Amino acid sequence: MGVIHEETAYRKPVPGGDPGAGSGAADHRDSAGRLSRWEATGDVRNVAGTDQGRSVASGASRVGRVRGQELARGVRAGNGGSAGTSGVHRPEVGSGRQEKTGNQTMKTLVTANQKGGVGKTSTLVHLAFDFFERGLRVAVIDLDPQGNASYTLKDFATGLHASKLFGAVPAGGWTETAPAAGDGQAARLALIESNPVLANAERLSLDDARELFGANIKALANQGFDVCLIDTAPTLGVGLAAALFAADYVLSPIELEAYSIQGIKKMVTTIANVRQKNAKLQFLGMVPSKVDARNPRHARHQAELLAAYPKMMIPATVGLRSSIADALASGVPVWKIKKTAARKASKEVRALADYVFTKMEISQ
């Protein structure tokens, strides 16, 4: 497959949107309304005086440290050149490399989009159900303060909260996610749920968050999980950046509407810049979600995206189907919904899961 460079992505007009979208530096506020400057150029900057042992529980004292600083300039989505970036890759199966941890190779995938309501959580939840039914040991981390994935997967809650992953790993690992005695290689689905304290992660420096979260991902790998799926908030914050730095793959569901499409260049640039520090990160691509086949605007936008980003569009789409919403509300995958209308949705979601499973080269 080809390579899409950051500079190339920026030169392309955004189909259905403002050609200038994403061309300027963007300001992002955290949940407390604090302002951080996000820029595309440069490397990740170390924040002077950071305490690597701090967790989000003590994050309030760190607000002044991060306010007004250019946190991790290498992951900013804004105006900047592409010199030195390795680009966003859509490699062929078999070309990726994952980190071996003990005897277990855990694959980590992040669903990310800087626009909400595009089917990101729905995609992640159905991947979790599909992989679980394949007999895999699946960890799901909900880093979205909205907690929608946590709601759907509440029957699989471990009692471990996502905010804890921005703190030190206990000496013996997290007992909440450890396999029960005798489970061994048995399939399991373990939810690390969102909680209100998670918002404090945005107060950490990115260097702290990256190290702490990365160490916790390695701890999960040591507990025998085959795959870790991470849902993220629809904003470019510390939580999303830390997840991308720890991930092997990233998938971006998109809605075929102008506002959603406008964020594509920013997401592509963010991923390209993260790859400067996390070379193993692979962009699986964009998957059109909530597609209305009867809407000519959706058809036009999809054709424009395919023309603009032919190597970055996943050959699978998920339609706008009420049965998917029914499934999410019921805490089950759409193929468990006993409605005729759910059959087509099930086929689409399963096709997407097959594609992602193949690209991730997950061993069974």
Curated annotation (Swiss-Prot):
Belongs to the ParA family. The gene is incC. This is Protein IncC. One of its GO terms (biological process) is DNA replication. Residues 1-63, 75-102 are annotated as: Disordered. Disulfide bonds: none annotated. Keywords: DNA replication, Plasmid. This is one of the proteins encoded by the trfB operon; it is involved in plasmid maintenance and replication. PANTHER family: COBYRINIC ACID AC-DIAMIDE SYNTHASE, P-LOOP CONTAINING NUCLEOSIDE TRIPHOSPHATE HYDROLASE. Gene3D superfamilies: P-loop containing nucleotide triphosphate hydrolases (3.40.50.300). It comes from Escherichia coli. Residues 1-10, 26-42, 89-100 have a biased composition (Basic and acidic residues). InterPro entries: AAA_dom (IPR025669), DNA_Partitioning_ATPase (IPR050678), P-loop_NTPase (IPR027417). The keyword Repeat does not apply. CDD domains: ParAB_family.
